[in-house]
């Protein structure tokens, strides 16, 4: 299966007051062109679709046009999750209706069971697990509400312990988080993450054949 892994589009971002609308249009055009040229089966957007939780009308139109070009014009599926800059509720509005099309899948808020979307190619099923941005408290309330000290790694460990993943199949995790061993880039890390508190241990991803992450603003390869 061929898919394009991207993230952190940050549609609507201003750079020191400078409007990046034209730059955004150029990048989104490139995304569509590459997906079409490479004959991608789907495009994975691993969080931070928008730069602000309340996106402007212009930003919403840009994203709608991107989906229209990929899904409707070219039949390329899109799988998306919310990042920390997105409003999960807004991003996933009408998601049940959109899923009926079989072309667009989006998850806005973390739940006890990670959303699984299964696509098929000539070799069989590929399972995409869509995990939007979460804080330790988001997961703590599901499994360990009484625990006082709870990190991102603890939260991810407990979340994975409650998933049923068939490791004999091909599995892809889509998430918006920091993995241990990343190189800090841009503004998407704080002091806690520098100290390693916000990092997920690499061995937590052992059930997945590929992990499509967002949150870091340059391309990196971590793990096997």
Named regions from a protein language model:
Residues 1-45, 49-224:
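Extended recognition/assembly regions associated with phosphoester-bond processing machinery
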